[in-house]
Amino acid sequence: MNESMVTPYPLVDITPRVALVDKIRYPMAGMLSHQVSVGIYNPDTQKTVYLNTGDPTNRYFTNISWAPDGKSLYLIELNREQNHAKLCRYDSKTGELMSTLMEETHTKYVEPQHPILFLPWDHTLFIYQSQRDGYNHLYLYNTDGKLIRQLTRGECWCKRFWGSTPRRGK
């Protein structure tokens, strides 16, 4: 991550008896932000393949997860305003974008906090967590980006996914 263009910001640490000031790079609204690239390092070849994500400015990459077969990498690309998120799949050997599986937008912000979780018995299905209806819920998708069904619902928060067992015929 290249933060050299981000203005240093003083952060005051009040935990010691005499406060200390530490300058951190903090991307203030309306000012330049850091530039991020995502690389995959192969210890066998000792080479790094960088994902071809396009322009590295004004975007965040979060919730990175591997496909169970290791052939692709999934991540969420989030714009700087944090109101538009895209779940993307990249080829782990070439770094090329394979597909954009889904997009989420909101007038205020989207808050992706969890990587996708593949079902251990069916690697074409994964669980995605979203607050799209105002509450954090679980959604079942396939690797083509098709919503299969909403798994949890209601005026409550799904705070953690503990696991599941396969149902016969499903």
Named regions from a protein language model:
Residues 42-46, 92-95, 142-146:
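Short loop/turn segments that connect beta-strands within beta-propeller blades
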Residues 49, 98-99, 148-149:
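A structural motif specific to WD40 beta-propellers
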Residues 82, 133, 146:
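Short alpha-helical
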